[in-house]
Amino acid sequence: MNPVAFEIFGLSVRWYGIIMSAGILMGMLIALKEAKRLGMDENLILDLVIFAIPAGIVGARLYYVIFNWDYYSGNLLQIINIRGGGLAIHGTLIAAVITGLIYARVKKVSFWTLADITAPGIILGQAIGRWGNFVNQEAYGVPTDLPWGIMVNGVKVHPTFFYEFLWNMGVFFVLLWFRKRKKVEGEVFLLYVILYSVGRFFIEGLRIDSLMIGSLRMAQVVSLAAVALGAALIVYRRKKNIKKT
């Protein structure tokens, strides 16, 4: 598949950017719908998105560049070239959380409420965004003989982008079900962190393009830490809530 969708005045518009934009748009619409359901001012979510999107893109790129510094140290101008990919979701999430914390403090609203509202939209956006990896022929796995393998450079490989798409869609529907059953604020977001990280840990083990730190796959290290932190925060916040009541 041609990664270039069309050209405007000689400028190539790539499918990767179109798909990522579609993911962001769908995620935002889901968040706005959830804010309306909870009676929150939708402008609060729109303003948050305006700040979080550029912060997330910068965070995603910095994360990717840091763990590929051997290449980028000799190709500094390529650091700002993101049209062909090179964005790491963990960098996005870290930057988005920091942005959300600052935004919540400035607006004097609960960070955990904002996080719960945006969590389903975030995972839906991630699911859609994985198709950008398909177009770019990236984020695929090791060779396989399984019937659903895809051909990349003449080799049949695991479609790990598709595994993550399916997992993320499953997490999306779980969050929609759980949002009306949470015990305390923040649990929808923390469940998102846990479930996404569990899936990412196992899927990452099949990939051949993982960001590495020494001999370790960075995404697996971050995923394990995220599961532990998410679970600990759920337990802590539930106990804290019980003490208050």
PLM feature spans:
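A feature for loop-to-transmembrane-helix boundaries and adjacent hydrophobic helices
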Residues: 1-245
